[in-house]
Amino acid sequence: MSDSAMEPQNPLTSGDFTAADEPFRLFSEWLKDAERSEPNDPNAMTLATVDPDGLPDARMVLLKGLDDRGFVFYTNTESAKGRELTAHPKAALVFHWKSLRRQVRVRGPVERVTDAEADAYFATRPRLSQIGAWASQQSRPLEGRFALEAAVATTTARYAVGSVPRPPHWTGFRILPVQIEFWHDRPFRLHDRVVFKRENPEIDWEKSRLYP
């Protein structure tokens, strides 16, 4: 027997993940696996919202915060997703790690992070990304690349000295999950699916397995 065969497996990342009784720790373990396996952006997730007419909208964003409250990403509040979340503060997320044959789905209401949280994260961003947050009128029509580069140059000159402050229209959103589903590929499409549900953060999660 090889040494690797003798090593105890982590039930949260092995085929026994269905025994987990709490989703956030399980998600954290899966994300760590993805950070070791995925070639690009293991924290990438599809964010789904709805527009004023109820038409679904989706795009890729990056997970930038995770705790037992929920999943956080940052954006321009005047962008399409920012406006949609302000008008209809509910969303869904999908993480798909192709190299691991795993998927996680998240659904729940959305809240804005505090100004202190947004300030703290903005301060960690590269300076050019901070400049871009001011220069880009996200989701609005752009005449051409030159117009964007001119806005970047103007903003760079404006903040040539000192730190770049966080724009008032730039903040984070936190998805407060009421449902988190874990999916793991199995042969012949006999996949493992486990879903955790709760109506609010004050109660315990209810777990159930689902047919593939």
Swiss-Prot record:
The record describes its quaternary structure and partners as: Homodimer.
What this protein catalyses is:
pyridoxamine 5'-phosphate + O2 + H2O = pyridoxal 5'-phosphate + H2O2 + NH4(+); pyridoxine 5'-phosphate + O2 = pyridoxal 5'-phosphate + H2O2
Q: Which HAMAP family match?
A: PdxH
UniProt-listed Enzyme Commission number(s): 1.4.3.5
Q: What does this protein do?
A: Catalyzes the oxidation of either pyridoxine 5'-phosphate (PNP) or pyridoxamine 5'-phosphate (PMP) into pyridoxal 5'-phosphate (PLP).
Q: Which UniProt keywords apply?
A: Flavoprotein, FMN, Oxidoreductase, Pyridoxine biosynthesis
Q: Where does substrate bind?
A: 64, 121, 125, 129, 189-191
Against Gene3D superfamilies, the record matches this protein to: Electron Transport, Fmn-binding Protein, Chain A
Annotated region (Disordered), positions in chain: 1-20
What terms describe the molecular function in GO for this protein?
Answer: FMN binding; pyridoxamine phosphate oxidase activity
Q: Name one GO biological process term.
A: pyridoxine biosynthetic process
Pfam (any one) = PNPOx_N
> What name is this protein filed under?
Pyridoxine/pyridoxamine 5'-phosphate oxidase
The note on the cofactor says: Binds 1 FMN per subunit.
Q: Which cysteines are joined by disulfide bonds?
A: none
PANTHER family according to UniProt: PYRIDOXINE-5'-PHOSPHATE OXIDASE, PYRIDOXINE-5-PHOSPHATE OXIDASE
SUPFAM superfamilies in the cross-refs: FMN-binding split barrel
Q: Which NCBIfam families match?
A: pdxH, PRK05679.1
Key word Iron-sulfur present: no
Q: State if Oxidoreductase is listed as a keyword.
A: yes
Family the UniProt entry places it in: Belongs to the pyridoxamine 5'-phosphate oxidase family.
Q: Which cofactor does it need?
A: FMN
Pathway assignment: Cofactor metabolism; pyridoxal 5'-phosphate salvage; pyridoxal 5'-phosphate from pyridoxamine 5'-phosphate: step 1/1; Cofactor metabolism; pyridoxal 5'-phosphate salvage; pyridoxal 5'-phosphate from pyridoxine 5'-phosphate: step 1/1
Where along the chain is FMN bound? 59-64, 74-75, 81, 103, 138-139, 183, 193
